[in-house]
Structures are given as C-alpha cells and as structure tokens.
Amino acid sequence: MERKLGTDRVKRGMAQMQKGGVIMDVVNSEQAKIAEQAGAVAVMALERVPSDIRAAGGVARMANPSLVEEIIQSVSIPVMAKARIGHIVEARVLESLGVDYIDESEVLTPADEVFHLNKSDYTVPFVCGCRDLGEAARRIGEGAAMLRTKGEPGTGNIVEAVRHIREVQAQVNKVVHMSKDELMTEAKNLGAPYEILLQIKENGRLPVVNFAAGGVATPADAALMMELGADGVFVGSGIFKSHHPEKFARAIVQATTYFDDYERIAEVSKDLGEAMTGIDVHSLAADQRMQERGW
C-alpha cells in the first residue's frame, strides 16, 4: 500500500504551533490530564520518566500501545511518544496508533548504533535531540521537524542542556556570518548536509524549532532555557517527581511563558516543596550518559 508522506513544510509548521510552550512527560491518563489543565501544549506518553529509566537500568523500549492509546483518548492536546533510535517498527507502530509526534529518543536504549530513522519516510513529524549543530543538521537532513537539546535526562541538572543550547546557538551564528564559499568546508567539519547549512545562513536561524530538554527541574530552569533562546521546554522527571505536581506544572508553564518576568517567576516558585533530587552529571560513568547515544 502506498504511504502518504507529510511534507517538511507541513511537519515543521505543526511543530511551530508548539513554540513557546511546555511539553510534559506523563506515564498515565491522570498525569496527562494534570498536564493539560496546567497549560501544557503537548504531552509525551511513556511508561517511565527518565529518572526511573535511569534507576531501573536494563533495556528501555517504546511504551505499551495500550498506554499510548489511553493517553491519546484522555486529552485534547497533541500526544507524543518515544521510539528507540533506529527502530523502524516501533516508529511505524506509534504512527499507526495516531500519535501526533514521534521522539526518536536517546532516553530509550538505541536499537541501531549506526543508522537513525529516515524520518522523511513517515507522515507523522519527528522530534530529535542534539548537542551541537552537526547533530542538529543531520537530524534535520533525515527529516526531523523539531529539535530539542539532549541535556542529560533524568538528572534534574540543567548544566548539559545549557551547554547544548549555547553550542548550537554559537555554531548557528558562525554559519550565518560565513560566505557561501566557506559553507562546504564547514559542512565537512560538522558532518552536516550542505543544504541545511545554506538554509540556516539564508534564514538566520535553524529551519526548525529547538526546544530545551534534559535536566529541567524548576521554574527557574525553564525560564533560563527560554532566556538562552530555546523555543520551548520539555520537562521529563521534574514535574511528577516533585511534591506538588499540579502546582509545579502550572509554575513551569508560567515561567516558560513569562521567562523574563522575574517577579512572576519568584511568585510561582513559592511553596512548591522540594524539587526532584538531582544528580551531578560529572559523577556519571560514560555508559550512563544518555546524551552520548546517537551521533
């Protein structure tokens, strides 16, 4: 049967609609409803949040289709779900379930250590993680409609997300000020498609939205990432590992929307209880660093 493929323009346009918003990880329909009521622009359906995936170890896979369907039916906002890097069938199954976006995610155990998915071959838009412009451009070249920093998921530590957003921004600025003659050499240095770098130079920015993810644990963290130029925020473990998830979720949304209103951020941050326990990323062994997955 011939598949109908969404165009890059349509997929990127769908992702643009989430700009300025918060996307929350949820593991059941109750959490999905809390996220929607708090003002999330979308939810990410998965069986365990990144901190629990990290603690459990073993192989992390796509969520059970029954759970994904339950969450889709429980909310009116878009629903995303994660597939393992390079796992063609997980992605096809999620597409068949009717998810609005697929996250080809390093949070799950990669299925393929050589190839990422050919995301242009799907109707549903994809979101992918990146640490630098080389990774960002390769994922866009494969058809990703939305990017996010990798950060270091499940740590509650924002330092890696900050590093990644700053690195991408600096490299984008460098490309914008290059001559076209220099772009091919830069494409070689970055391992990036020349056509994507040309789009960046001509538009003055990435051709897709780039959200912050990986370590957002407080309203101030969310506001910081927006201040640094992120187009929106993914929050994984931070909300439902906090003492007051409903209040915490609303505070994250407010801080993301009004990221430069520091009095408002101070107000919404009051009486939230203790944030999730964090992990010093420098204490992680190399095989525990999820951001290293993919290329």
From Swiss-Prot:
What's its top-level EC category?
lyase
EC number(s) in its UniProt entry?
4.3.3.6
Catalysis performed (reactions): aldehydo-D-ribose 5-phosphate + D-glyceraldehyde 3-phosphate + L-glutamine = pyridoxal 5'-phosphate + L-glutamate + phosphate + 3 H2O + H(+)
Keywords per UniProt: Lyase, Pyridoxal phosphate, Schiff base
- Annotated residues that bind D-glyceraldehyde 3-phosphate are located at R166
Pfam families per UniProt: SOR_SNZ (PF01680)
Which positions bind D-ribose 5-phosphate? D25, G154, G215, G236, S237
**Active-site positions on this chain:** K82
Q: In which pathway does it act?
A: Cofactor biosynthesis; pyridoxal 5'-phosphate biosynthesis
Extract the PANTHER family matched here. Answer: PYRIDOXAL 5'-PHOSPHATE SYNTHASE SUBUNIT SNZ1-RELATED
Family label: Belongs to the PdxS/SNZ family.
Described by its record, this protein's role is as follows: Catalyzes the formation of pyridoxal 5'-phosphate from ribose 5-phosphate (RBP), glyceraldehyde 3-phosphate (G3P) and ammonia. The ammonia is provided by the PdxT subunit. Can also use ribulose 5-phosphate and dihydroxyacetone phosphate as substrates, resulting from enzyme-catalyzed isomerization of RBP and G3P, respectively.
Q: What is this protein called?
A: Pyridoxal 5'-phosphate synthase subunit PdxS
Query: What organism does the record attribute this protein to?
Result: Oceanobacillus iheyensis (strain DSM 14371 / CIP 107618 / JCM 11309 / KCTC 3954 / HTE831)
Gene assigned in the entry: pdxS
